[in-house]
Amino acid sequence: MQTPSLELKGSSFTLSVLHINSQDMAVIAAELDSKLAIAPQFFLGAPLVVNLSAIKASDFDLLGLKEILTSRQLIIVGITSALPVINDMAKSIGLAIVKSGKAATNQPQMPKTTKIVKQNVRSGQQIYAKNGDLIVIGAVGNGAEVIADGSIHVYGALRGKAMAGAAGDRNAVIVAQKIEAELVSIAGQYWLTEHLQQNEAAQSGCIRLEGDSLTVESLPL
């Protein structure tokens, strides 16, 4: 029997959501550039859904926002929580209208394996623990990336980027003896350096998700 040339199947994907709280395109562009300068590879080519729940004006420049994002190699696939007139505008420029989903009743499958790295992770290196947790017995240097579908434990200083719950596991955590990271992310929610610097507990801590926000708690040394 000949295989059909196409098949339509249901599936789900984890997308980052960009919340827009201003109508000033210059301000949006400047703030976006500052974030991209800190972690360019993390955002490069990232598909985004734009949340416009904070925008109450019908003359919002959606096309201008799209151009700002695409010119920086970010891919806007749709918008959510927007006014009806903005939804109509989105359809006219080829963007999807994404409905806010209900909280998932089933969490992603728990990690099955643990990857252990018994050395420092140096600048330019990327370590990925697929379908499992990642344990680094050593430091993660500036410019290095550690990624896991589960949790990340660093028995040393975390100075690079750490992305846990990469497959959507919201129960994942990031634990490190010293957190001086360029970026930390759990299931798509992220903090950059400035957020961590504001939190004194981050010297030795555990980062986790509470709702849609990251939190950090100090650990005994």
Curated annotation (Swiss-Prot):
Keyword terms, alphabetized: Cell cycle, Cell division, Septation
Biological process, per Gene Ontology: cell morphogenesis; division septum assembly; regulation of cell division; regulation of cell septum assembly
Gene3D superfamilies the UniProt entry points to: 2.160.20.70, 3.30.70.260
Role played: Cell division inhibitor that blocks the formation of polar Z ring septums. Rapidly oscillates between the poles of the cell to destabilize FtsZ filaments that have formed before they mature into polar Z rings. Prevents FtsZ polymerization.
UniProt family annotation: Belongs to the MinC family.
HAMAP family: MinC
Quaternary structure note: Interacts with MinD and FtsZ.
Protein name: Probable septum site-determining protein MinC
Organism listed in the record: Shewanella piezotolerans (strain WP3 / JCM 13877)
